[in-house]
């Protein structure tokens, strides 16, 4: 796939569909050839998947293997970086999993955009 590959992450409790859609619309307007990936969780991940379906944007889901216990999330996050090879990250507000994802992405030298409600169009 040519174009921008965007990893989307954020909190499970973040259910602001309009906000997530508006911010991803901004990314799509700048990068019409894009694909996204997410971690398959409820909240932002699920909303990002819905957004991708509504906009015919290719989406890849990386579910965590929770049988691995507390390291499942960080291992899934590393897998998203290694296998999807994103060119950037959109990190919506979240908790420890989002913080781990952004730490790993920044350590890999990827740009991370952290949208906040004030950026809503």
What spans do the regions from the language model cover?
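Acidic/glycine-enriched connector segments
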Residues: 2-6, 14-121
